[in-house]
Structure formats: structure tokens, C-alpha cells
Amino acid sequence: MKREHHYLHPRPEPPSVATGSNRESYLNTGKAKLWEEEVQLDGGMDELLAVLGYKVKSSDMAEVAQKLEQLEEAMCQVQDTGLSHLAFDTVHYNPSDLSTWVESMLTELHPPPTSHLDDSSFLAPAESSTIANVDYEPQLQTSSRIFEESSSSDYDLKAITDSAIYSPRESKRLKASESDTDVFSTSAIGASNFATRPVVLVDSQENGIQLVHALMVCAEAVQQNNLNLAEALVKRIDYLAVSQAGAMRKVATFFAEALARRIYRLCPENPLDRSVLDMLQMHFYESCPYLKFAHFTANQAILEAFEGKKRVHVIDFSMNQGIQWPALIQALALRPSGPPTFRLTGIGPPAPDNSDYLQDVGWKLVKFAETLHVEFEYRGFVANSLADLDASMLELRPSEVESVVVNSVFELHQLLARPGAIEKVLSVVKQMKPEIVTVVEQEANHNGPVFVERFTESLHYYSTLFDSLECSPNSQDKMMSEMYLGKQICNVVACEGADRVERHETLTQWRTRLSSAGFDPIHLGSNAFKQASILLALFGSGEGYRVEENEGSLMLGWHTRPLIATSAWKPGNNPVVAH
């Protein structure tokens, strides 16, 4: 199928890089601003340094370069004595004024003759670069939070509010550590012939706030078609991400890549090979409970719908490797009344190499069903899109003979890329007269028309997902799962039009769509909730996962943020009124 590539139409470049008092930044110090109001690029300031937040006139470049050389020489000269005299009580104001700031550093590096250098007074090593789950107030508190390395999975980007991003912050002091004697005493034994090297303090908390702010400003620049500014910010994001650890660094790197692809219009034209996608999804399945929860809750609803039925037929919109169905086959085999005849129709896209992967999956399921003495029929159905399906293609039998169930896990949102596609598919599903329709979707709104809002929502959502992955004990599964999610991030941020298929919507939005199409909700029973809770309890390192019931649907989230939702539906008796 031929695909079209759509991109946002360029918008007029704004008169300034940023306007309004609410754009005050955290970059560098409290009185420094990332972007001064009404910045004029031709006002004598060096443009590249201005983008990074430094005010340097082009005419002063030679003088600043000379001072930087002097600063480097001074730093080398104090290696034997350390930096204990540096900035005990001195506040360095406005480092955006690069010339004055470097000059103040030079002054600090030449202490008075009477100053006493204490061997134990070194700058403290940097704390963990992970930003913890902190509720930032509009004004940052004077006492900084200390972030331990063990809390790398506690970071929740959602906790960083817009007011925290743009409000002014108090000036910081650069202080020496009080415990450096213990830190360096062991290394001094037997190594006294080596000169003590100055320790550079990396404020990971500060950089983390700058990183979030740079991501947001870059998204705004992209939306305003200010691509020069956006390009410079992407480079800064990469620089700031290096100082972070764990989920924060990984999320920022994926979003920076996606922003760069959008800036340079490099949206991936060809999807990954089907085998690669299946491999990544399998690692995602193993590393965290999201897919397990999706399959388990859907299977529980299907099992209850099949109670007492002799012949059952599942139409799966998300066949992939068929990992959902062995558990259902086993549950049907254990029915007190005996297993029914089970027919499965698996639907999937064509493979790039034209291999019949759906048939291979079917053979594995047939062999598995034989071991459990379940009469099993399988048919694989290849379709470029679910919108290409017609009920007549599926060899449906009368409802008196065979009970039909339709299952969709993370598939329906892709139909939103094509106008009218979701309405057509839901109409076809209704023609199938299913006993139940199980739907699992991401609990997020990544389908809004405004790019900045979509970017912000996806940044919050995937930050939480990556945070939960930090609990995965298997590093290979975790790495592959991050690649799996990174592909989604790239599609949400970098692509537009028909190419943007990761159009996730919330449970509330899906309720509106399905109700408008003539479906009534089915409440998932309390048994499904209890069983899902047991599943999470058995999942290793799963203390942060939470199951909650929402008006008959079940949600799985990380701490307080729901991430996926399972709902069940049946065709309503009332006819759909066309609007």
C-alpha cells in the first residue's frame, strides 16, 4: 500500500525567541535567564553563545578567549593544593555574563597569601544524577534534595510542573564538602606521588531541571517552525542528558532523537522487519507485566463469555506471535464440562519478506492444543489494515452454532491515522455479532492536534514507563524493551499524517467512540481484579505496579499513573444514530 508523508506546514517565525515573563528559566542561576525577553539576534551578541544562554558581544570574543586561557592555566596551577578556597561564601551571580563570570573565577583561584589550605577540603563528588519523584513548588526551596543512586526508579517527570519549569530560582552557592577527608584518605595512601586533581561538581539536579526545560522549549520552537533554535536546543539536550542516570537519561535521548528527526524531516519511511518487531515485543513482554496484564484480563473476560458454549471462535486483531492464547487454551481444557471446539482467526500485517509467519504461529498453537486434547482450528489472515476487513471474509457461522469473540490489544489506536477507518472497523465488528469485544489500549492522549501538548503528554507517559522498566532484573530484556518504546516515541514525535500511527487515546475517549458506534460496556468481574493483583504480586520487583478498577474496566499503572486499560464491550440493542 502506498503511503503518503505529511508534515506540519511551516509557521511564521516569531518576532523573538521567547516572550512573556513566564519564560524565565532555571538555566545556570536564579537570576540568569535561558532566553532574555525580546532577544535581538543582531544586537551585537554572538548568536551561537546566545542560544546557549551566554551574553557575549562579538567584539569581546578575543578578551573572553584570553580570560578562558588564563582560567585554564590557573586551574592547572592549583592542582597540587586543591580547590578548597574556592567559593566558600561567594555567590557567583549571572554566569550568563560570561566575561564577568570568568573574571570572578580567576579572582577566586588566586587566594590571599594568608589563606589556609586544608587537605580535607575538596569539592564533594557529584550525587546521583537521577531526579527523584519530587513535587516542585513554584519557587524551588533553598535546601536542595539529595538524590541517592538507589532511587533511580523513583523519578516521575509528571511531578515537574510548568510553574517549576519557568519560575525563577534562588541563587546557589558552590560549597566544599565536609566529608572529603574520608572520601580521599584511602586513595592518598600509597599514591602521595600523584598530584591531587581538582574535582568538578556536576549538579545533576540542576541539569535535570534544565533538561526538562530544554525539551519543552525545543518542542515549542518546533511548533513555531523556529528550526534554528530547535536544532541548537537538541544539541544542548544531548549534552545535559549525559549528566543524568537511569530512566531520565534514556527518555531524554529518545525524545532528542525524535525531535531531531522531526526537525530534519527524517520520519522512518519503512517499518522495522516483522521479525525484529516481534523480538522487541517479546522482550517487552518478559521485562514488565503490561502485556501479561493485557492478555490475562482479556482472557479472563473471554473465558467467562464462553461459559457453557460448545463451539467458540476468537477473532484476534493483534495476533503477532500468538503468546496470548496458550493460557486460554489451557483454561478451556480445564473446564469441568470439558473443553469446547476452539477456532482461532489470527489477523496481522504482511511480512516484508513475504514469509507466512501467521501460519508458523498457528502450527505451534495446534501442537500445543493437541497436548491438552483441545479440538482446535486455526486460520491466519493477512491484511494491510484492519480497515480492509469484511465480515464475509471470516467464514462466520450462525450464533446458535458458534459463539464469537473479538480481541484487540494495542491495535485500534493505529486506525485513527486514517479518516473513517475506526468507524468502519467497529461497524464490521458489530456485524460479527460477538458475545464480547475485549479492548486493551494505552492510557494516554497522544492524538491531540497541538504538537506541544502531545509532546508534553508523551514525555510524562514514557518517563513513567521507562521508570518502571528500571525494576527489570534482566538487562537484555530491559534494553530491548527500551528500543521497543523508543520506536513509539519516534512515531509520536517525529511523524505526522498517515505515518503517525501511535495515536493513543484515553479510556474515556475510547468509551465515547465505542458508545457512539453502538456498543455497551461490560463490567469486568471482581475475579479478574483479584487474579490480576495476584499476577502482579508474583511479578518480581513489582512493588510500584498498581491495579485499579475504573467503572468496570481495569487499569495497570506505575505508582499513581495509569498506563494501560482493559475494557469489554458488546453490541447494543439500540441502533446507531448517524450524525
Curated annotation (Swiss-Prot):
Its mRNA transcript may be transported over long distance in the phloem stream. Such trafficking may regulate leaf development. The lineage of its organism: Eukaryota, Viridiplantae, Streptophyta, Embryophyta, Tracheophyta. This is DELLA protein GAIP. InterPro entries: DELLA_N_sf, TF_DELLA_N, TF_GRAS. A motif (VHIID) lies at residues 312-316. It comes from Cucurbita maxima (Pumpkin). Residues 494-570 are annotated as: SAW. One of its GO terms (cellular component) is nucleus. It comes from the Eukaryota.
